[in-house]
Amino acid sequence: MAVGGGLTVTSLMRQSARYNAHRLAVRFKHQQLTYAQAWQRGVKLANWLLALNLKPGDRVGVLEDNSLEAQDCFLGCAIAGLVRVPLYARNAAASHVHMLSHTDCRLVIVAAHYADEIEQIFDQLPVLETVLIRDETYEQQLMACSDKDPEVILDPEDWFVIRHTGGTTGNPKGVAYSHRSWLAAGRDWFYHFPPMEAGDVCLHVGPISHGSGYLYTPTWLAGGMNVLVDHFEAEATLELLSSAQVGYLFLVPAMLSMLARHPKARELSFERLKVMQIGGAPIADDTALLAREVFGDVLYQGYGQTEAVPVCMMGPKEWFSEVEGSKPLRSAGRTLPFARLEIRDPDAPEIEMALGESGEIAILCDGQMTGFWNNPAATEERMTSDGFVLTGDIGRLDANGYLYVLDRKDDMIISGGYNIWPAELENTLLNHPAVIEAAVYAIPDVKWGETPAASCVLAEGAVVSETELIALCARELGSYKKPTSVFFQKTPLPKSPVGKIQRKTLREPHWAGQSRRVAGN
């Protein structure tokens, strides 16, 4: 078989399927498939989709959890040359409509238990022609499709997937990855990792349409096995890490905290574990140190955004070392060899700030967007004339090149003329052993205009007072930065569909009835 088109996700996955035909490619619960079996299912779905009058380059919306059928979709769209548009299960209907309409999706593939969400908005989507519901008839229909590879010829610059930003302010923005940029992102994720070998196992506790998906393709290309779970549960994850001899996985800090603090973590063996990749949110020092004690030197931290990823990375050797003039434990790592990172003047983004000065983080890497999908105004706002992506994050670089992320540009609190970054306070609060979640935001104040307030979730059975936490922040950061109020809640903090804490949701009730609020807050 000879299929032209250069280095694409599809051509490389096809090659790996051929060379690893009898190895295990995927496992979900008690089901598992070899590479040959998984590829054949992908080919069948590709032919099914092409028979629905779709053509390469068309966009296909997808609403699903991790499952064997999710892998069918990943492979089937790649083989057919279709562009996946993953939807988020926690999205409101209006977000589904926006994501499907502005990408002109002609078809949606949806798991049966989410079908109502798509059927309810079908009439609002004039371009949408077909909804493929994966119900009890799916398997029979799939098996009836041809298993002859359509051998669609693709170019490395053809679009592969459109992921959407978290949408914490305004509508989510579409970020399109070409085959080339998706492969580059996967390569750069694995640059610092111990080499993955055929037969190694990568566990996906989050959807492969989210952050964990960056590890899916490299695992397949290396001849490894992707193990999928449809939801995260700490004890079950620990048992799977041990029994499946997992080598690699992606976690957000809250998940790592739950794993490290679970009694089972000290009872089980994780001898094959090589990498616990942490990302998506700041991690508390105590959590990182405890996880290292429990799991060993397997923690890796990365920094990037949907728009450009990864840019920074740090392995355990650096993360937990002492470096004169730097605090690696508090940093997001150092710039990868194949990327550039600069601190730009927030008011004049063409100007680079001096080392040690804070400003907007600007990034440039192979795995970045060329612009937002169908949104030239947002593209112009977020991309510089020399090709850098403006992240909206405020940070600084020290003399050794370590990046410290201070906060989101739009979340800055201005209290009595002083600039206060919520993330700095959140990190301090999270370093208290009783606090497992923290969010800081502005509330109105008659004297100062606005002041920081914090909402915290405590570990089970933990006790700490508002006074203690306020004193901790004053001691660590200075009195003018301390929160004036700390609110405790028993339920998890509100999060966006991609897992980011929504400060806006916590902040808004405090501003109800106010005639104005400070810009950006």
Model-derived features with residue positions:
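Gly/Ser/Thr-rich phosphate-binding loop
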Residues: L221, V246-L251, A260-K327, R340, ...
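AMP-binding/adenylate-forming catalytic core of the ANL superfamily
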Residues: A70, N91, V108-V110, L241, ...
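Conserved AMP-binding/adenylate-forming core of the ANL superfamily
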Residues: A2-T10, R14, L24-S67, Q71-L75, ...
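Conserved beta-loop-beta connector loops within the AMP-binding
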Residues: F338-A362, E381-R382, A399-N400, A462-E466, ...
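Conserved AMP-binding/adenylation subdomain of ANL enzymes
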Residues: L183-V201, S209-Y248, H262
